[in-house]
Amino acid sequence: MDAVEFSKGHGTENDFVVLPDPEAALELTASKVAALCDRRAGIGADGVLRVAKAGKLLDAGVLDALPDGVASDDWFMDYRNGDGSIAEMCGNGVRVFAHYLAAAGWESRTDYVVGSRAGAKPVTVHSGDAVHGAVTVAMGLVRELGPSTASLAGWAYPGIGIDVGNPHLACVAADLSGDDLAKLDLTVPPGYDPDLFPQGVNIEFVTPLPTGAEPAVDMRVYERGVGETRSCGTGTVAAAAAVLHREGFRIAEDSGEVRVRVPGGAVSVRLAGGQAWLRGPSVLLAHGRLAGEWWLEH
C-alpha cells in the first residue's frame, strides 16, 4: 500500500491528525484512529479529522445519510475521538479543518459550509497562511438540557446540561480560585447522571474571572472518549452559555459574549437567539507520510 499523507494541527492546543481523503478512499477504523492518536506509538493527538467530500462519504457507507443542511459537494469533517469513537462535532476541529483547506489550496472561499455529523457549520476564514489561521465557526443551536451535577474526588459540582450538537455538563464554580481549578484531578473521570447523558458527556469546570469589558472565564474540560484536553471548542460554548445563564441570561432569547480561557489559549464565544459563534486560532505545524505497512498493520 502507498504511504498515507497526514498533517498535524491544533486549535488552542486541542490537537489533531488531519487525513486528506477527498474521495473517502481510506478505511478509517477505530483501531487505526486510536493508533494514530497514541502519543507514544503513534503521531499523538486528541482526535482525527478526515477531510472528504460529504457525498463521497455517503457513497462509501461512512455516512448513512447527509446531515441537515449538508450538500453532497460540501467539505465534511469526519471527526473521530482519540479512542476511535465517532463524535458529532468538534469546534476546535472545524477551525483546524477550515485552515487546512485554505493552506492546502483546496478552498479559496472565506465563507462557506463545513459539514459535520451535527449538521452544517458555516465558517469564516479571517486569515490562513501555511502555519497560522483565525476562523469563526457558526456553532448552531445551543439548547439547555436542565440542571445536573458532576462529582469529582468526593465533591459535587452543580451544573447545567447544554447541547451544542454534542452533550455537555458545564459546572460554574464561582467559589473556586484559579489555583483551585488548576489543582482539580482530571486524570480521574468525573461522575455524572447516566440517565440524563446515556451516551456519555463532556464535562466543563468553569471559574468566572473579574468582570471587564466582557465576561471572561477560566475552563478545564474532561472530554468523553479522550480525557482531559487542553481545549474543547464546543465545551467553551457550553461554558459561556452556563456562566451567562447563571446571571439570568435566557439562552434561547438573549445575546452576550464571553472570553473563555483554557490551558491551551483563549477563544471568544458569542451567543444570540439560541445560536453560538466561536472565534479562535489554528496552527498547522507539520506534514508527513504514514508508512503503508504501518497503516495496514493497524
Regions found by a protein language model. Give the residues of each.
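A glycine-rich beta-to-alpha transition motif near the start of alpha/beta enzyme domains, typified by
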Residues: M1-V131, A170-H298
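Short, charged N-terminal helix-start/capping segments
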Residues: H10, G61-D64, S148-A153, Y157
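Non-cytosolic beta-sheet module surface loops
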Residues: L141, D163, V221-E223
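Glycine-rich, charged/polar anion/phosphate-binding loops
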Residues: L145-P147, G154-P158, P189-Y192, N202
